[in-house]
């Protein structure tokens, strides 16, 4: 029973396919923007779990994986990829440094105003 469900999950490719199989409602606008982030977070939640899927029924697995996918999806409903830091590029990103004052230095002050006079031919 559970093996056939797991095989179905292994064959899924698109994020929408996971949501349909697990019967999780979603906003297509959120999914379009964060599909890779949601699927990676879903994978992270599965990896962090310690459930023995071999002893579960298909319905139990559907509920279990559905709850993890829904949790991953909700992470991005009211948040951003930068805040959630799913991928390495965001995890390693340094916080913005405070702005420093930029001073203007005129060319005249560097080379002297008298040297800038143009010559007419």
UniProtKB/Swiss-Prot annotation:
Claim: Ribonucleoprotein is one of the keywords in the record: no
Pfam family, one: NifW
Keywords: Nitrogen fixation
A biological process term (GO) from this entry: nitrogen fixation
Its biological purpose: May protect the nitrogenase Fe-Mo protein from oxidative damage.
Family: Belongs to the NifW family.
HAMAP family linked: NifW
Assembly, per entry: Homotrimer; associates with NifD.
Protein name (Swiss-Prot/TrEMBL): Nitrogenase-stabilizing/protective protein NifW
């Amino acid at each position: 029973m559970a093996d056939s469900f797991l095989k179905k999950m292994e064959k899924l490719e698109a994020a929408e396919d996971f949501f349909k199989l697990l019967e999780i409602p979603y906003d297509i606008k959120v999914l379009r923007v964060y599909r890779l982030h949601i699927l990676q977070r879903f994978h992270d939640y599965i990896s962090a779990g310690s459930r023995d899927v071999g002893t579960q029924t298909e319905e139990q697995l559907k509920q279990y994986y559905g709850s993890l996918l829904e949790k991953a999806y909700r992470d991005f409903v009211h948040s951003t990829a930068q805040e959630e830091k799913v991928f390495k590029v965001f995890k390693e990103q340094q916080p913005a440094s405070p702005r420093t004052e930029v001073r203007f230095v005129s060319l005249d002050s560097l080379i002297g105003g008298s040297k800038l006079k143009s010559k007419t031919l």
